[in-house]
Amino acid sequence: MTGYVTDALFGDPRTGHPVALFGTAAARLEHRLWADSKPRGAAYAALCTFGAVGLGAALQLATRRRPFARFLLTAAFTWVVLGGRGLAAEGTEMARLLEAGEVPEARQRLSHLCARDATALDSAELTRAATESIAENTSDAVVAPLFWGAVAGMPGLLGYRALNTLDAMVGYRSPRYRRFGWAAARADDVVNLVPSRIGAALTALCAGGRARESWRVWRRDGSRHPSPNAGQVEAAFAGALDIRLGGTNSYGGEVESRARLGEGRHPEPVDLRRAVRLSRLVGLAAVVIAAGAAPATPWGASPVQSIGSRWGQSPARRSVDNSAVAGLAVHNSAVAGLGVDNRR
């Protein structure tokens, strides 16, 4: 919970962001290892990802007898791998630019959300692109880190963010990365299979009076997207907001036609603001679930539980009702249960 709240209050670290440092190191390794080869790309993805997982596992083991240190590290890693505040800020700024009719500025701003070619996009297409990115990144930048943090603690947090970053760097279908980036892209698909569907279900849960429509559109249209994961949350958002997503997109000169998701109107800037609000609600629901799930997983168990357990076993505390300690542990279990963008 501490990491989630820190991200909500302050957003990404302004300097020396660990994800940016990882990206710099990964880019240097790519320069040394690149070849138009799937095996070479798989080796590159494995080195980068297992390096991050290994660091997380080493810190998890090193702090097994130091619950407060584990608490601080888990909170810090959760903060740096989450992107909820930054995502909401970018969506809100895009909505402001589009409402003001500042289309050239909105075209430039879209690159903060996705890799789509915005050169020829009008206001309607910019709105659709931003709304789709808000939906997809609600899963990628919020739900998935929380899920992997709850399941696998620090190794899960760092490993997931490493894979997601590699996918954003090399997971393209361009001539350079079609083969070299294949392994990173497929691995990212695998680790997002469960979180994306949790994100879609939470979207329907948070859709208020359109919960049934969100669920129906998700189940009907989620598999129509070329990505096994992005379409799940995008379809749920389309149903929740009563809008239509999908269409023709351009990436680096390659044109891609995607199936329509939903059956409502074309999204407008006001719908982009609604998508941001829905994204925040989904994030809150996800952190509540992560808080409840973390104590049940060996690597995701809350360090506060360990603190409470040791305190309760001390002679000075034997007379204290242990249920208070247990309640404190449950309330704070999100500490370890918590845990921007890809080929759009």
Describe these PLM feature segments.
Residues 1-344:
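Short amphipathic, positively biased membrane-proximal segments
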